[in-house]
Amino acid sequence: MSLKKSPFFELRSGSVDTLLFIVKTADLDALRAELVKRFEATPEFFADDVVAIDVRRLADNERVPLDDIRGMLSDVRMRAIGVVAQPEQHAWAAGAGLPLLEARDRRAPSPKAADDAPAQPEEPRVPAAGQAALFAQAGPSGADAVAPPAVAAAPVVAAQSATLVIDKPLRSGQQIYAKGDLVVLGPVSYGAEVIAEGNIHIYAPLRGRALAGVHGNHDARIFCTCLEPELISIAGIYRTTENPLPADVLGKSVQIRLEQEKLMIEPLRLT
């Protein structure tokens, strides 16, 4: 076989980030009801986004019909492109015709392993995706809290990639991804998306989506001078406009951080 390069196509190793739809129950009726509850009012929210179905949270004796789950996701306009599974799940997970994918995070422990393990602070969860990291660990719920005002100071984190600075407005449909921290000097419009593996700083209104710590960094934070978002997410734990923000943070300068797997939204003192 000739090794000469073709001018028409090329095959090379690569990786693609995507959403993880983490299945935590084998009860399809409950799963379907929750999907409808969360997304029927905003069917365009994840319109045409691709996802990988993650079944690693299921118990050893649990199986789910992946074709049915693929259909559920299609109903809310998400497209399943593969399955993430534990090695012992590969035999049945591969039967749906979807490719088995490797996640770049720590593997989610099985329920049995979690029960046997000693109590300790929860490890960072499955990182989500290059376009939306944050799906399925937590959603828009009353558990998200608004905390008392905090001093505007970013946490000290390990050095990552260089900070990416965007000095132009982001319009609907635009997406920015930063391997480290991300600084945005212009407004993030509805339908625009900013994603970072580190912290996100937005010195203008945030009206689109902001997703920090997308590879499981629970110490990442979001800083914003005017909070009016479609979605905010840190390490996959997210909140949407389906759960309205309190008046003391809506449209205000805030920082957003994680505490005990909950999003804390804190007004900032900037003067």
From Swiss-Prot:
Spans annotated as Disordered: 106-125
Pfam families in alphabetical order: MinC_C, MinC_N
Cell cycle as UniProt keyword: yes
InterPro entries: CAP/MinC_C (IPR016098), MinC (IPR013033), MinC_C_sf (IPR036145), MinC_N (IPR007874), Septum_form_inhib_MinC_C (IPR005526)
Family annotation (SUPFAM superfamilies): Cell-division inhibitor MinC, C-terminal domain (SSF63848)
Highest taxon of the lineage: Bacteria
Function: Cell division inhibitor that blocks the formation of polar Z ring septums. Rapidly oscillates between the poles of the cell to destabilize FtsZ filaments that have formed before they mature into polar Z rings. Prevents FtsZ polymerization.
Summary of subunit composition and partner proteins: Interacts with MinD and FtsZ.
Name of the featured protein: Probable septum site-determining protein MinC
Species of provenance: Burkholderia thailandensis (strain ATCC 700388 / DSM 13276 / CCUG 48851 / CIP 106301 / E264)
Taxon lineage: Bacteria, Pseudomonadati, Pseudomonadota, Betaproteobacteria, Burkholderiales
Gene: minC
